[in-house]
């Protein structure tokens, strides 16, 4: 019995999870770049002394934010996971767990986004994350909620929820490239009978269907020359890569994905024409327009949820941005 004929593929990204988008090289690089750029910066717990804010290195929060937030997680992986959650799911939920004796934060539990239900009407979070040992109903003030782009101020949306069409095109392009290399660039087409109306019927239709399956299987097996029986004709219908401007469309999707993430193409190794000065300016623009909003969002949320309102003007959290300005003397002076 002949195997069924192949049909057109639908991009897995249209119906799959957002995490599957990491199979696309540009998405993977953008997510990795943003998450590791945030994690690479130490965050300082600052205390007001006189008229100046100074680092409070003896604070328990300093240890949690820079060394070990949870029992089995280091700070770098912790911040990487937070930014990845924001980019891929739109939300990152952190629950501070306090020591009942000292009343200090004992650990910062990063919850799985799928285990959190946010009731925006009553501003409550229902969490059932037994892996991280966090479950119950929490008030809005008890959960550190880092959001992506939000339309209502309460729930974040992932970048991929807006870039799904472009990402789907990129995924389809990758699949098409794989198929072109896998089958040697075999063509697609129609099996027809050149006798027009004469001789057609149920039996002839079944024979044409069987011929189509046989020809498709022969092309799939790697044959380049296939004989057709009788007056059966094969008419190719697929366009070549040149006709489809296939490579140009793939270049376009790379830059289109970069636009959604706010990442310059040079950071995903797409633009090879940059000189040293333009690369330096791209790095400065990346910090000021792309990375800094994420840093500011995290700093504000930590201050709001970890510091009492009466001390909010005397404490602050601040990422040390000096490392990112290492090559830009003008920005370091400012």
Feature roles, as predicted:
Residues 324-334:
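Charged substrate- and nucleic-acid-binding regions of tRNA-handling and nucleotidyl-transfer enzymes
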Residues 240-243, 283, 331-333:
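Short, surface-exposed amphipathic charged segments that create phosphate/polyanion-binding patches used
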Residues 283-308, 312, 316:
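Long, compositionally biased
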Residues 279-280:
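Small-residue-rich helix-loop
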Residues 189-190, 253, 298, 332-334:
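A general alpha-helix detector
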């Amino acid at each position: 019995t002949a195997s069924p004929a192949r049909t057109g593929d639908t991009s897995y990204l249209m119906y799959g999870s957002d995490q599957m988008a990491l199979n696309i090289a540009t998405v993977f690089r953008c997510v990795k770049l943003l998450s590791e750029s945030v994690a690479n910066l130490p965050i300082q717990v600052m205390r007001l002394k006189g008229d100046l804010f100074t680092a409070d290195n003896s604070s328990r929060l300093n240890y949690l934010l820079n060394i070990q937030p949870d029992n089995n997680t280091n700070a770098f992986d912790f911040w990487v996971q937070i930014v990845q959650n924001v980019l891929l799911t739109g939300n990152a939920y952190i629950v501070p767990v306090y020591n009942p004796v000292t009343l200090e934060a004992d650990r910062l539990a990063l919850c799985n986004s799928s285990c959190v239900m946010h009731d925006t009407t009553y501003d409550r979070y229902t969490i059932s994350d037994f892996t991280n040992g966090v479950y119950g109903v929490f008030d809005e003030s008890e959960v550190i909620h880092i959001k992506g782009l939000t339309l209502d101020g309460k729930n974040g949306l992932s970048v991929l929820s807006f870039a799904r069409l472009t990402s789907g095109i990129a995924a389809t392009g990758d699949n098409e490239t794989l198929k072109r290399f896998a089958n040697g660039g075999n063509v697609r087409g129609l099996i027809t009978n050149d006798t027009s109306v004469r001789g057609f019927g149920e039996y002839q239709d079944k024979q044409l269907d069987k011929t189509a399956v046989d020809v498709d299987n022969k092309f799939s097996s790697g044959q380049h020359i296939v004989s057709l029986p009788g007056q059966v004709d094969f008419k190719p219908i697929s366009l070549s890569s040149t006709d489809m401007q296939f490579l140009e469309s793939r270049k376009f999707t790379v830059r289109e994905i970069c636009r959604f993430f706010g990442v310059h193409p040079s950071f995903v190794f797409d633009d090879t024409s940059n000189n040293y000065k333009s690369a330096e300016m791209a790095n400065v623009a990346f910090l000021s327009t792309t990375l800094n909003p994420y840093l500011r969002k995290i700093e504000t949320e930590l201050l709001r949820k970890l510091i009492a309102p009466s001390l909010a003007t005397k404490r602050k959290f601040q990422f040390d941005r000096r490392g990112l300005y290492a090559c830009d003397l003008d920005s370091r002076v400012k």
